């Protein structure tokens, strides 16, 4: 089975034998035999020499396509773009379907950001189902495979009712509030004592961290909250993407930073990243050998209840 990049989709517990014939000699013949059951974590172990980062763009603004995409393309980076379905071709300043499809066809990941960017925690059960489920159908009706959801306003990941709806339609969901996400959901010592990513406790209580509350760092909120200049924000960005080195020391990949952007160089006063700054940030990632991946490059191991990074043969792009 393949996705829009034409690469193999690897599922947990499936034994895969892959033979790649290459006439470049550089790659030669690669034989991979991988068990994604109990040994799924070994995929992350094989990537310890890599510094990883996931780039997210929320809302589907046209400036992301017009201004950020050329910078991503320069370095071969791919990102996850979260689309508000009813904004497409209905609100000025947002992408149209042709632009979204171009992103997808070029190997970027497209996720759902609801139908109307609603406050999910304030909605009825029926309204939640519409915002969450119909938005996936909307994207699929345009030929786009969707696996993840991003919470509008970062609200709803602590609601059992919202999570019950999200989990019916998506493999993963993302909120904000942390420089890194911990693949075993065990790094938030002040908020939780959990050691895995199960969604509910034995008492059916919603856990603090799980695959439907993957945490990212909001680049724009960080600027607003701290009144950062571009130079300040660049320093903070560098600090955030390198935070993983505290946890990924010669063992399995345990933590990955997820950077969340909104507007991209459209001169708005809030939630905007100047393109000059964005270029400096992407240049930093490239020059320091970061591997840029997307949300769909994360898998979930059901038996062990943890997230993992899929095989390097299936990642979106290294940007090397």
Regions found by a protein language model. Name each.
Residues 37-109, 116-119, 127, 131-156, ...:
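Active-site beta->alpha N-cap acidic-glycine motif
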């Amino acid at each position: 089975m393949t996705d829009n990049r034409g690469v193999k989709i690897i599922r947990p517990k499936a034994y895969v034998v892959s033979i790649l014939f290459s006439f470049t000699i550089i790659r030669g013949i690669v034989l991979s035999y991988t068990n994604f059951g109990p040994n799924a974590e070994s995929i992350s172990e094989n990537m310890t020499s890599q510094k990883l980062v996931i780039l997210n763009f929320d809302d589907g603004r046209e400036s992301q396509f017009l201004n950020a995409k050329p910078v991503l393309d320069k370095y071969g980076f791919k990102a996850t773009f979260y689309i508000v379905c009813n904004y497409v071709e209905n609100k000025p300043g947002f992408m149209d379907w042709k632009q979204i499809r171009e992103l997808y066809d070029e190997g970027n990941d497209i996720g759902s950001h609801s139908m109307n960017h609603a406050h999910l925690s304030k909605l009825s059960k029926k309204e939640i189902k519409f915002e969450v489920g119909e938005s996936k159908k909307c994207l699929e009706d345009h030929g786009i495979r969707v696996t993840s959801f991003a919470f509008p306003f970062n609200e709803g990941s602590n609601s059992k009712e919202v999570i019950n709806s999200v989990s019916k339609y998506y493999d993963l969901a993302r909120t904000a509030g942390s420089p890194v996400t911990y693949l075993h959901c065990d790094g938030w010592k002040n908020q939780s004592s959990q050691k895995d990513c199960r969604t509910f406790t034995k008492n059916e209580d919603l856990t603090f961290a799980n695959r439907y509350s993957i945490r990212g760092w909001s680049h724009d909120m960080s600027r607003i909250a701290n009144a950062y200049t571009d130079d300040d924000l660049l320093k903070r960005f560098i600090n955030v993407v390198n935070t993983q080195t505290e946890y990924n020391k010669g063992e399995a990949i345990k933590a990955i930073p997820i950077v969340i952007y909104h507007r991209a160089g459209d001169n708005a006063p809030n939630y905007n990243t100047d393109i000059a700054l964005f270029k400096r940030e992407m240049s930093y990632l490239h020059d320091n050998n970061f591997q840029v991946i997307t949300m769909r490059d994360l898998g979930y191991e059901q038996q062990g209840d943890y997230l993992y990074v899929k095989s390097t043969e299936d990642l979106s792009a290294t940007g090397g």
